[in-house]
């Protein structure tokens, strides 16, 4: 499966000057919503991701995603795995579990995102689950932006990765783009302004 080509065909592989949810800048941005707007394609991708997870014999009960970007990917993965799905969301900048969702003591979760960059939002969701007595046994994403180590792709972990080293991350593909601190961004030096295409409200 050529994930890069799928993103390009869907108009989801963007080039420009982007402000990421981390506050860093990049010349490229992956807009997974453009991929996931097609239910058949979303189902196909998450069916493939479910097969990868199953091949590692990971035992889990439910899937949780951080809103907003992870919801479609997480829901489709839950369908493919025949598991329960819940999501966390930010309230005044703080990740919470709302809407009557519950976590049972000892319930095992995979946290699913559309894109994992450093893994910050996924880690926030994992901490919520663990604080309520659940157990996170792994992470999943359609795509990894190259910082976190992916179990099935054998890519190395980089310095900025936030996901725990002892838990696996599964993804369909890796995208490695240069990411810059705002104060040393070569795109800013050329006089262009970073735009924020993402979903996190900050």
From Swiss-Prot:
Name recorded for this polypeptide: Orotate phosphoribosyltransferase
Keyword NADP: no
Residues reported in the UniProt entry to bind 5-phospho-alpha-D-ribose 1-diphosphate: 113-121
CDD domains in the cross-refs: PRTases_typeI
Gene: pyrE
Class of enzymatic activity (EC top level): transferase
Swiss-Prot/TrEMBL catalytic activity: orotidine 5'-phosphate + diphosphate = orotate + 5-phospho-alpha-D-ribose 1-diphosphate
GO terms for biological process, alphabetical: 'de novo' UMP biosynthetic process; pyrimidine nucleobase biosynthetic process
EC number: 2.4.2.10
Native organism: Campylobacter lari (strain RM2100 / D67 / ATCC BAA-1060)
A GO term for molecular function: orotate phosphoribosyltransferase activity
Family as reported in the entry's similarity comment: Belongs to the purine/pyrimidine phosphoribosyltransferase family. PyrE subfamily.
InterPro entries (UniProt xref): OPRT, Orotate_PRibTrfase_bac, PRibTrfase_dom, PRTase-like
HAMAP family: PyrE (MF_01208)
Reported cofactor(s): Mg(2+)
């Amino acid at each position: 499966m050529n994930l890069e080509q799928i993103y390009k065909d869907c108009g989801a592989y963007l080039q420009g000057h982007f402000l990421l949810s981390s506050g860093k800048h990049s010349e490229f941005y992956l807009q997974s919503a453009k991929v996931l707007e097609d239910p058949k394609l979303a189902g196909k991708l998450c069916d493939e991701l479910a097969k990868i997870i199953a091949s590692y014999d990971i035992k889990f009960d439910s899937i949780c995603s951080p809103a907003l970007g992870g919801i479609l990917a997480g829901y489709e993965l839950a369908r493919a795995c025949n598991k329960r799905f819940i999501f966390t969301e930010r309230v005044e900048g703080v990740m919470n579990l709302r809407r009557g969702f519950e976590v049972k003591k000892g319930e095992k979760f995979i946290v699913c995102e559309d894109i994992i960059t450093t893994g910050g939002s996924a880690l926030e969701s994992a901490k919520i689950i663990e604080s309520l007595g659940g157990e996170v046994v792994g992470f999943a994403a359609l795509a990894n932006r190259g910082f976190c180590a992916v179990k099935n792709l054998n890519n190395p972990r980089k310095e900025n990765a936030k996901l725990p080293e002892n838990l696996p991350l599964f993804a369909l593909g890796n995208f490695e783009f240069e990411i810059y601190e705002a104060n040393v961004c070569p795109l800013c030096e050329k006089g262009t302004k970073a735009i924020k295409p993402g979903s996190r409200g900050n």
